[in-house]
Every structure is written in C-alpha cells, then in structure tokens.
C-alpha cells in the first residue's frame, strides 16, 4: 500500500488549505488516481490496523439495500452512528440507490442486479455502471454519497472496477473505501466466474483534515508490510446471500491502530 502513503505525502506537500462543511478545515488536492492489482494481494492498509469487521458488514448492509443502522448495531459496527436520526434512519443513502433507485413513473431500478446481468450477458458493455448520486434525493440523505459512481470492465477473463469518489477523507475513510470496493470486485468476480483484475480509485476533493495531521505523520513513519490475501470460503447462489463468515483475511499483520476524530 505504498501508493496510499504517497498520496498522504502528496496532500501534505501540495495541498491547499480549505474550509469545509464540517468546520474542521482541510489540506486538499483535486484529482488523484491509484491502481491496485487485486491479483497481488488484498489492498488493506498495513501501516495501521483497519477494522475489517466494519468494512465487511457495511458492504453486506449496502447490498441488502438497507439504510437503517439496526443491522450494523447488531454486529457491533458504529461507523454510521453520527449521521443517523433517533430511529436509526439515514434516508435514501447508498443501499437505497444501489438496489432501488426510484424512477419518475414509480418503478425502482436494482442497479446491482442489473450490473450482474450485464457482466454475465454483455461483459463488453461500456455501460456497466452503478451511481449513488441521485440529485433528486440528495436533500433527503443524512450524508451525500462520497463514493458516488463506479464502473466495471471485463478483459481477458478478469473483472476490474473503477470508482469515482467526489470527496475523500484520506486518513480515516480511504482505507475503508479501497478495501470495500476490492471486496465487492472479488464477490462480483466469483458470481460471474471471472478472475479479479484491477481496482482503480479516482478521487475528486482528496483531503486530510486539520485534526488528523499528527496521526498522518505517525502513519508515514511506518514501513508498509506484505498485503494479506482474501479467501472466500463458499460461493453462495446469489451476490445477496453472502454472510460475514464467508470471508477470511490471511496474513494480515498490520502496525497498531491509530485513533482519530471523525469530522461530522
């Protein structure tokens, strides 16, 4: 994950001081891309421990189309707590848009099921895309989508994915985002009888919060370790039937975790 550390250093060296919605303040750059060959290991940051349980459960939650944090709480995941209302609802965030995008005539489009069908039946299509950026519902969402748009690509029997992330918290959020989409590529590839290819991450406003600087310098002082390996222990009948216990990460030997405040 040397690329990730290089991005951190680039933001420190080249970033512009900006104000932001949370009032915290950031160092920010605009436009950055990283490419991870998923054949070479699972891209889970090793210069600090990442909470893999949260990453897996959040993705399973998205894929169920869920937008209430009850499932996350049942599994001791608290990463969405700050944005939920008193009933645990978040409004029409990722899961709703992925699985039930509303149309003007009252129908709902399951973008994930559509993408799966495209990958199986028309893998050369240039329209294998999922968007969470529903302009008509942004004002109903507790938090507008940060990882907003992703596209799949099949070549030589390998499945690749590119994500556009319009806003990126480099220290806290980005390690989660990279691992989450890498996991999704592995799941999609298994369901479509493909090998994994690349995960390409493209960032828009890519920033370090002003209260993450000490933690960033600590992380940059650490040497990356070998990437772990993802093992999927069974192939469910459907993408929507995976369970937490289906996934195992082998050889994950990270440096200790580094705590940092979340900007709300």
From Swiss-Prot:
PROSITE patterns the record matches: THYMIDYLATE_SYNTHASE (PS00091)
Pathways per UniProt: Pyrimidine metabolism; dTTP biosynthesis
Keyword Transferase found: yes
A UniProt-annotated Pfam family: Thymidylat_synt
Catalytically driven reaction(s): dUMP + (6R)-5,10-methylene-5,6,7,8-tetrahydrofolate = 7,8-dihydrofolate + dTMP
Highest taxon of the lineage: Bacteria
Cellular compartment(s): Cytoplasm
One Gene Ontology cellular component: cytosol
Protein purpose: Catalyzes the reductive methylation of 2'-deoxyuridine-5'-monophosphate (dUMP) to 2'-deoxythymidine-5'-monophosphate (dTMP) while utilizing 5,10-methylenetetrahydrofolate (mTHF) as the methyl donor and reductant in the reaction, yielding dihydrofolate (DHF) as a by-product. This enzymatic reaction provides an intracellular de novo source of dTMP, an essential precursor for DNA biosynthesis.
Subunit text: Homodimer.
Protein name: Thymidylate synthase
Naturally occurring in which organism (per UniProt): Salmonella typhimurium (strain LT2 / SGSC1412 / ATCC 700720)
The encoding gene: thyA
């Amino acid at each position: 994950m040397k690329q990730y550390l290089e991005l951190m250093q680039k933001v420190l060296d080249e970033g512009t001081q900006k104000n932001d919605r949370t009032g915290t303040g950031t160092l920010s750059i605009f436009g950055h891309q990283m490419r991870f060959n998923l054949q070479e290991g699972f891209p889970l940051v090793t210069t600090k421990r990442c909470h893999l349980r949260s990453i897996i459960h959040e993705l399973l939650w998205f894929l169920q189309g869920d937008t209430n944090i009850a499932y996350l709480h049942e599994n001791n995941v608290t990463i969405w707590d700050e944005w939920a209302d008193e009933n645990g609802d978040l409004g029409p965030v990722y899961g709703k848009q992925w699985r039930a995008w509303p149309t003007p005539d009252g129908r709902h489009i399951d973008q994930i099921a559509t993408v799966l069908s495209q990958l199986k039946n028309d893998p050369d299509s240039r329209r294998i895309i999922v968007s969470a950026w529903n302009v008509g519902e942004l004002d109903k969402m507790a938090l507008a989508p940060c990882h907003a748009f992703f596209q799949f690509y099949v070549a030589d029997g390998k499945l690749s994915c590119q994500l556009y992330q319009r806003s990126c918290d480099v220290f806290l959020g980005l390690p989660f985002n990279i691992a989450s989409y890498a996991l999704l590529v592995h799941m999609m590839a298994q369901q479509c009888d493909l090998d994994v290819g690349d995960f390409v991450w493209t960032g828009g406003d890519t920033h370090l919060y002003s209260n993450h600087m000490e933690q960033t310098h600590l992380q940059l002082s650490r040497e990356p370790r070998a990437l772990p390996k993802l093992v999927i222990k069974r192939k469910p009948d459907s993408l929507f039937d995976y369970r937490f216990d289906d996934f195992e990460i082998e050889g994950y030997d990270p440096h200790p975790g580094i705590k940092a405040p979340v900007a709300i």
